[in-house]
Amino acid sequence: IFAHRGGMAMRPEQTQLAFDNAVEYGLDGFETDVRLTKDEQLIVFHDALVDRTTNGSGKVSEHTLAELKRLDAGYHFTDINNQTPYRGHDKAKILSFEELLELYPNMYINVDLKDAPDTYEGRIAPKVIYDNIIKHGAQHRVLVTSFHKKQIQRFTEYNQADIAIGASEAEVAE
């Protein structure tokens, strides 16, 4: 069983709070998303803009990793009582993909490349994710997916380590 965005209904999505909670529940892994920052680092983040889930604004690609790590990723999260219990929490921060791999060495990770293939970020993200996976020896526990078929094709060009690859929507429909 995988926690979607780390378990976004229970904790601020794609934060250490969410991933820790999924581990505590005994889940097998996480479904997560990655985007490339201005300084070409991968972060664990779904949206192209930081506005919906943080106290910041603008595109992920217009901020450095250091700038993004200063944002409060628990800022807009509300619980079932419409409270904001994780606002300002030290584990409600944006994680880099490398941090995710380091913090959870025994968890499976289904990672979705979000950056569109026709953007600068999209052109280099497949190589960056491949390099991160190899650097952390995580090739046996990561599945790389994307709604963009071109991203899977690009990742495949680098993939000499037999890292699992998910089918695109078009491939599933065929």
Predicted regions and their residues:
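Phosphate-group recognition and catalysis centered on beta-loop-alpha active-site segments
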Residues: 1-174
